[in-house]
Amino acid sequence: ERLDREYNQTIITTVPNVEYQVHKTDGTMVLVDNPSQMPPLGNIDYITEPYIKAQIITPTDYMGNIMKLANDRRGIFISTNYLSTSKVDLIFEFPLSEIIFDFHDKMKSLSKGYASLDYEFIDYRKSDLVKLDILLNNEPVDALSSIVHRSNSFEYGRKLCTKLKQLIPRQMFEIVIQGAIGAKIIS
C-alpha cells in the first residue's frame, strides 16, 4: 500500500521460485524459473535444482524440533557442533526451494525466536521434480502451477485443492478443482 501511495508502484504477490536446470532428451538444457516454462514431461531427461549449505544455530532445547523441520524439508544432515552446553550449531544441505518460502518463520516459531539461519549456495543437484498443475473445470490455471518434488506432490496438491475449495465462493454450477501431474490426476 505504501509503495503504491508514495511511489505509484503496484505490486503483484507471487510464490517465490528458484531457477531449475531442465535437461531435455535432445541434449539441450533450459533454465526454468516459472512452471509455465517447463517443457512437456516426455521431453525431459532430468531436472537439477539449486542446493544450499545451511548453518542453524539454536539453543539445545529446540534442537529436536529444528532437526524434524529440516528433515521434513528434505534437509541432508551434515554435522553438529556444540558451541556451549546450551547452544548448538547444525549444518544441513537443503534444496533452495525448500527454504525460501516459510522455513525461516517456522524455524523461529519452533525455537521461540532464538534460532538463526545462515546459508550459501553449493551447486545444482539432480532431483525428482514434477510440474503440479491445478485445474479448474479441467482447465489448467498457470498462476497456481508449481514445481515440486514428486514425494511431496500428492500432499501439496491435496492441500492446495482443499484451500481453493474453501476460498472459491459457491456458484450455481459445480466447479471441479483438481491437481494434476501431466495427464495424471493426483488430487
Task: For every predicted segment, state its role.
Residues 1-187:
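Accessory interaction regions appended to the cores of large information-processing enzymes
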